[in-house]
Amino acid sequence: MEASSNPTTPTTAVATTTSTSSPSPAASTSSKGHSQSATASASASATQSQLLTTSLEMPKTEDLYNLSVASGLSEGQRSLSGAPSASSSPIMSPQGKIFGRNANGTMITTSRPGNEAEVQLYRVLQRASLLAYYDTLLEMGGDDVQQLYDAGEEEFLEIMALVGMASKPLHVRRLQKALHEWANNPGLFQGPMMPHLGLCETPPKPALIFNPDTTPALPRQKFPSFNPSGSSFMPSPVPPAPLPASASVPAPTVPLATQISCPSAPSVPLPLVLPPNPLTSSPHPSANSNLPANTAHQVSSSSPQLTPVLTEAQIQRITMCADKIGRQLPQREPRAQTTRKRTTRELEQVIAMGEQDPRRMDEIRKYSAIYGRFDCKRRPEKPLTLHEVCVNEAAAQLCRNPQTIWLLTRRDELFPLARQIVKDAGFGHSASIARYGGLLTQLPSQGAGLGGGRAPGDTDCESSDAAVPSKRQRLSSTEAAQLPLDLNREAVEDSRYNLFAMYQKFAKPPFDLSEIAKFSVSKAADYEDNDSRFSFSNSSSPTMPTPCNGMEGERSPVSRQMETSSPPRESVDLSGTSSGAALSGVQVISAAGDNIIAVANPALALSPALNEVLALKRSAASPET
């Protein structure tokens, strides 16, 4: 009795909890024959031995009973993190578990931090959305964040391999970014654990089953599209129940224990899903009707990372082009794998997954990645470019179709198809991706769009032809308020574009010289002599392939002037004929029959020297009267 009333005993509260199961007679007998100080020390040592014996001899049924809350969490959430389960740790005490919320909104059950170093590690992993690795790092003594930050490249990769993060380069990159933030501003990762961090300690006997159907959505401002009751995190395809109307906007101070439904009688501790409570559910299912179907993808893409993230419009564009190419591919069997690796078995499991499996798209993205795959030798700190992200997304969308999922085993055929999809979608390089990303947002506001009278969703995938009018409009949309130098440069760009298009059309015989009138220079006149000094005669024109009819390639302006000054042999000045009015901008210097030998560069039309030479040639070619 004296030992129980002694205030100096450090573990009095714990001793009262365990004394009911295995009381210690040694502590009571020793307290009667010794002094007050000896009684306190003896009772403390006896209590510690009781705790050690109880923790080592705990039956398996009690372990399963206490871990029911951790097993009741959705397996879809743990599969998204890709980390080992936190409830499988052998050193974790069921009484010290808490629910932690990652930065991307996922709930993870971890052990409660006990000191300042563990709090810093917890906050760093929470900032990187990697709380699933918290208990694994504690098992290996990784509670020193400074040691992780100061580790060299080989040592850091070895630690990542021991933790199980080496095969997930995106997780490694997020951890490195969080460590750099911790080094730059350590004040954000210090301080006691506050309730606003989304933590809730588990009861000593957590005979509760987490019910995602009756759990209202927590108030979140940074990620409004995330909802823990969505069907993307369900372990089985169970239709989601409507959210209660009274609990749609709960108070921030409501503990998590009120959001976990408790059964009325003791049941088997399995991760069962209870039916929704008819007393609290509302017959209006409008609170959950506007959730997107790809909630898991939005959660993963909102995590802090250095790799660019595609917008929904860009993903929709790539998906449309992938479906178009996928319909043209034959249905084949997956290639037989000869190696007995673990990835081979996992790949077969991914191919056998059903279309309703919430993990299917994430696993397809994992194994269909062309750049930065989990088993590649790419450096983790080297982020992917926007083009590489597009190629990876195109490969994933192409393998999403059950008819073309066999491409997961034929990466040599998947790579060129993915690049073709990106090219058809108009995402050939980063500049076109950024430009087309802004163009897609303007499509609903335009009446006709790129496809004339078609809807924006029916735009043809061959966007190279559709982007030509916008490019030409961008080149020729000069306002009168611009400077004369800008006007001159814009005119030269238009002239070169028209000349290049003309050569493309008339590179192969037979010709129709009457169609040359379609290519006219719009800004080839009304310029002063001062502006004509900005001539681009030294710049190279577009190189054209030499046709089979022996047409000469591009020649310098000096050679053209030498030819025009020589006596015309079989030259025909088409500008002096009756169709000269139609041929307003293009001047044919020399031609033999229907074959054009030399055409004046429209960019040099501003030069007075060339105009004088052409005037002399025109007067020499005209019949004498």
Swiss-Prot record:
InterPro entries listed in its UniProt record: NAB_co-repressor_dom (IPR006989), NAB_fam (IPR039040), Nab_N (IPR006988), NCD2_sf (IPR038398)
Superkingdom, natural source: Eukaryota
Region NCD1, annotated ranges: 111-189
Compartment(s): Nucleus
Pfam families in UniProt: NCD2, SAM_NCD1
Record's keyword annotation contains Transmembrane: no
Biased composition (Low complexity): 79-94
Region (Disordered): 1-47, 75-111, 220-247, 276-305, 447-480, 532-578
Record-level GO BP terms: locomotory behavior; negative regulation of DNA-templated transcription; neuroblast development; neuron development; regulation of DNA-templated transcription; wing disc pattern formation
Keyword annotations from UniProtKB, A to Z: Activator, Nucleus, Repressor, Transcription, Transcription regulation
Tissue/organ expression: Expressed exclusively in a subset of neuroblasts in the embryonic and larval central nervous system (CNS), as well as in several larval imaginal disk tissues. Co-expressed with sqz in a subset of neurons in the embryonic ventral nerve cord and with rn in a circular domain of the distal-most area of the wing disk.
Function: Transcriptional regulator that can both act as a coactivator or a corepressor depending on the context. Lacks DNA-binding domains and acts by associating with other transcription factors such as rotund (rn) and squeeze (sqz). Acts as a coactivator of sqz and is required to limit the number of neurons that express the LIM-homeodomain gene apterous and to specify Tv neuronal fate. Acts as a corepressor of rn in wing development and is required to limit the expression of wingless (wg) in the wing hinge, where wg plays a mitogenic role.
Record text on subunit structure and interactions: Interacts with sqz and rn. Able to bind mammalian EGR1 but not Drosophila EGR-like protein klu.
Protein name: NGFI-A-binding protein homolog
Gene source species: Drosophila melanogaster
Biological classification of the source: Eukaryota, Metazoa, Ecdysozoa, Arthropoda, Hexapoda
Gene: nab
